Amino acid sequence: MTRLLLGAAMLALLAGCSTVKQPELDVAVQSSGQIWNAVAHYSGRTFLSGPRWTGTQGPQLTAIDQNGQRAAYPSGAWNSWAPGRDAANVFVNINALRLEGDKLWVVDTGSPEFGGNPVSQGAKLVCIDLRTNQVVRTYFFGPDIAIAGSYVDDVRFSAGKAFLTDAGNAGIIVVDLETGAARRVLDQHTSVVARPDRDLILSNQVVKAPDGQPLRVNADPLEVSIDGVWLYYGALQGPWFKVRIQDLTNPALPPEQLAARVEFFADIPATGGSVMDAQGNLYFSDLAHDAMRVRRPDGQIDTLIVDERLHWVDAPFLDKDGTLWLPTPQMDRVALFNKGKSLVQWPVAVYRLSTQR
């Protein structure tokens, strides 16, 4: 009798689980030849970046119109860099895109090689007006800001400042958008340095750098709290920390005092990227599980979807309709991390996922 009751209970549990449907993934765009790691969507156009170090060919920044036509953006000239060429008005290696109103902000690491040094005038933040398709301002990071080993990674904005993570030579870069002045903060602080006890695992395997050691990626994801008080950030493998923006932007605050004001935020797992909505929901990819999750303002973490197609979602984009755009560059499968042999499964896609339930 006990076995019958247990069996009935198990069947009921399974039946209950079967009614929980995952949201559907919709393919927005896909590529059979270039890896895309970041996406933005504006007025019917989709913008995609393809970092040079992955070894695939194509523009650093591509625009796809409503008819599916693809073109280098904002021009072919901006996508024409070659070794030895002046890098001031060309993209060397784009790592991130950020849409703010009608402006597209482009983060150029300036380093054509993973783990390499930025070339002269290569590391920069470029602002493009999407109404005119013109570059309206470029913020250059000289050798005192994008230092040897720097990999300027991602960007967020608040109160006239830009905040960028340095995933190579660990730190945070603060830029005054009016004057263009930039400075480094929290250099090599424990909150920006990848921890040795947190490996990056995908497909149940530790991702290894070209030297055979476990890959470590320093300060990478970041977000600004919806009230503009905090900057949230962390190494790619987590966890995340927070610091008040008023402290970050105070040049008179001694480095040791700023470091003392850093607080723990959340134990976010290894993530390729994140995006926060107007309610403070933090959407992030969970690399180890091919999943998208969301951290609610109260700290609860919910799962949106688990799907093997979402392999290394890198930089989610949330559009005005509440749809997540999810690029899946499969970074762990590129030749650089696999002894020179690419394991990328083509085509590489950007998926759409509704956050509305």
Each language-model region and where it sits:
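Conserved beta-strand positions in repeat-built beta-propeller and related beta-rich domains
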Residues: 48-55, 106-110, 164-168, 225, ...
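Beta-propeller domains
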Residues: 48-80, 115-117, 129-131
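Beta-rich, blade/repeat-based domains predominating
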Residues: 32-43, 85-101, 107, 144-161, ...
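Short loop/turn segments immediately following beta-strands, especially the blade-tip
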Residues: 131, 177-182, 189-191, 243-254, ...
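Beta-strand-rich domains and repeat architectures in extracellular enzymes and scaffolds
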Residues: 28-59
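Beta-propeller fold detector
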Residues: 70-79, 136-140, 183-198, 250-265, ...
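Loop/turn-rich, solvent-exposed surfaces of beta-rich toroidal or solenoidal domains
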Residues: 225-245, 259-301, 307, 313-314
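Blade-loop segments of beta-propeller domains
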Residues: 67-113, 118, 123-124, 137-145
